[in-house]
Structures are given as structure tokens and as C-alpha cells.
Amino acid sequence: MTDNNDTWTVAGRTFTSRLIVGTGKYKDFEQNAAAVEASGAEIVTVAVRRVNVSDPKAPMLTDYIDPKKITYLPNTAGCFTAEDAIRTLRLAREAGGWDLVKLEVLGEARTLYPNMIETIRATEVLAKEGFLPMVYCVDDPIAAKQLEDAGAVAVMPLGAPIGSGLGIQNKVTVRLIVEGAKVPVLVDAGVGTASEAAVAMELGCDGVLMNTAIAEAKDPIRMARAMKLAVQAGRDAYLAGRMPTRKYADPSSPLAGLI
């Protein structure tokens, strides 16, 4: 059973669930809210440019997912320059008072890989303005350290391209990021199914963020529940410490004293 005292902290805020879920691609707000509940997530990430969180004349996500119970993490999805991302998060802070934010500055529409030069520049500006940026980045330990130095409160390397469902393509570099970071590390993007979420946690990550894997499942609510259990299982496996790998067999029962 997962230890309820096994919490994680980002920017002075402590959480029990290590699964962060998105709010895009769902059939409607009702389904989104049900998936969040099934996942056990305490944080949801919201695309400021796409999801209504401030216009009371239109359906609002906050009517379905209570911001008093769930932490909202505004993100800059769809931004391709540092200026766009900074402006978007300034608007988010004006609308809802949010300072803990998710920064992503994309390099191109085909791969949705981050533009790290623009990302680092935006991180520096946002940190100076009092934001607490959790930052989407490439799976590169050097880039992750640069982001940390620039003021990132968490680094979020991609496992694979956003929405691809390809799973974690480079376990070695993700592990290196975990080993070198002094801030939380969360895999962001690429997870497609529960086993891949477990892998992220087994690598020592502090958490996993996902959207498409749940929203595009045939049964999003069931998948949300599966992801919750997978993240817990992966974390427990990491804390337990896996057995060493061996070249040859090692019998489970002693060979001495056989009849």
C-alpha cells in the first residue's frame, strides 16, 4: 500500500497525488471532471488560451472542477515565442491570481518540441516577475540544469512528443535529469498507457503529467483510474528498490539438501 506520508513539494506547496492531468480533448466538462476525480489528481493543468476560466457568460471549467479543492496550473499551450508565453501567463495571473504556472514554448507545430532558447528566456523573465514556473523541456540534463538556474521550480522533460503516446523514449537521460535536479522532475508528454506511467515513476521522477492518454482512451474514466494505480505502483517500486539484474539464473529455492 502506498504510504500516505510519501508526499512531494513544489514551490512550498505539498501534494499527495503524483499524477497531474490536463483538461483538453474531453467530450465535455462533465467527463473531464469525472476523469479528474477517478485519477485522484490534486493538480489540473489548463490551457489559458483555449479553456474558459474567466468569462462568466460561457460554460466555465471552474463550475465542474472546484479550484478550492483542485489546484489549477495555467499553461502556455500554443505559444511559440517567449513573449507570447509571458503575456499569456500575465493574463492568467490577472484573471485568477495564479503564480504557480506551467511554461511551454514550442519550437514547431509538427513535433511540438520545446524551443529551449525561448523557454529559458521566458523562465528568467517569469521568475523575476514572481511567477513559479514548472517548465516543459527536452529530455536533456544540461538544459534541465539551465532551467533550474533560470528559476524553474520544477523541470518537466518530455517522454515523447506531445499526444504521441509513444512512451518514454530515453530512460537514460530522464534518469540523469532526476539524479542532477534539486527541484521536482515530472515526465510531461508521451505517456500512452499505465505501464509507461509506472516506468516514469520507477526512474525516480516526482510525478507524471498527462492529458491525451486519458482523454483519448476508449473509456477515459477507467484509464484515469488505471493511471492513478500505475503511478502509485511505480513509486512504490522505486522506493522498494528493484533486484539487481544478472547474466545467469539464480534459483529461487536452494539447491543444497535436495531429496
Swiss-Prot record:
Record-linked CDD domains: ThiG
EC number: 2.8.1.10
Molecular functions (GO terms): thiazole synthase activity
GO BP annotations listed: thiamine diphosphate biosynthetic process
Principal cellular location given in the protein's record: cytoplasm
Pfam families, sorted: ThiG
Entry-linked InterPro entries: Aldolase_TIM, Thiazole_synthase_ThiG, ThiG
Catalytic activity, reaction form: [ThiS sulfur-carrier protein]-C-terminal-Gly-aminoethanethioate + 2-iminoacetate + 1-deoxy-D-xylulose 5-phosphate = [ThiS sulfur-carrier protein]-C-terminal Gly-Gly + 2-[(2R,5Z)-2-carboxy-4-methylthiazol-5(2H)-ylidene]ethyl phosphate + 2 H2O + H(+)
Pathway assigned to this chain's UniProt record: Cofactor biosynthesis; thiamine diphosphate biosynthesis
Family stated for the protein in its record: Belongs to the ThiG family.
PANTHER family: THIAZOLE SYNTHASE (PTHR34266:SF2)
Name assigned to this protein: Thiazole synthase
